[in-house]
Amino acid sequence: MNGAELKAILKDGGRVFGTMLSLSRNPRWLPVLDGVGLDYAVIDTEHGARSRGELGDFLTMMNTTGVVPIVRIPIPDSHYVTMAMAAGAQGILAPYCETVDEVKEVIGAAKWRPLKGDAVRRVVETGEHVSEATKAFLEERNKNSIAIIGIESVAAVKNLEAILDVPGIDGIFVGPNDMSISLGFPDQYDRPEYQSTVKHVIDTCEARGIACLVHHQNPELSSYWINQGARFILHGTDRRALTEGFRTEFTELRKVADDLPK
């Protein structure tokens, strides 16, 4: 799958499945992701420790698989967008966006690279292009580019309709930890206030034909939000998969050993 194919699935009302890679730095193991049921993976550079060179190697290897690489950039800034895309990302996730101006900057860099300055501002704000030839060239060049906007605070939710008016958004990301903290109930995901807020985000986005990602760590919570309408499904992390895999298997092995005669 590539970015254009992933976007087409979402546009048709389908679902795609992915995970977050926050711990891994060595790209040699990435080909195994091709057969585990992932459509995409988000490489976390907001919280994960990777150099620019390491990210480039990571993306080069991931692009040999059928898993679409999306980079979560540190902040909603055009410099980080273009840096990730130039390194080989087929999409970006811009965290903690609260204003229309932030979103316009991200979309301009993700969808119309390498256009800059006043030219990209006019494209994003008015749809005015330098020429039809330039428009066609940039659309073809960036056809795989995926732009995901992070809605992770009360302020962002209040501004959601205006943010969604910016053309070019392919997905809206809800970060449960940040959102619950902003609501005043850190990590209390069963609170009605949290659930109603996230449901409002999903419903508002779906009314515009935009799919949502709600990133939870356990299958029960991820399943809940799939049932509530999340279609851009983002579940778990490499760290959790490693931890839970070891815990499950070594618990089983210790039980076998404990059952043996002393």
Stretch-by-stretch model annotation:
Residues D77, D118-V130, S145, I151-K158, ...:
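C-terminal alpha-helical cap/extension of soluble enzyme domains
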Residues M1-P69, I75-P76, G108, D165-I169:
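Conserved N-terminal beta1-alpha1 strand-loop-helix module at the mouth
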Residues R52-A86, G108-D118, E139-N142, D190-L213, ...:
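Alpha-helix-loop-beta-strand connector modules within alpha/beta enzyme cores
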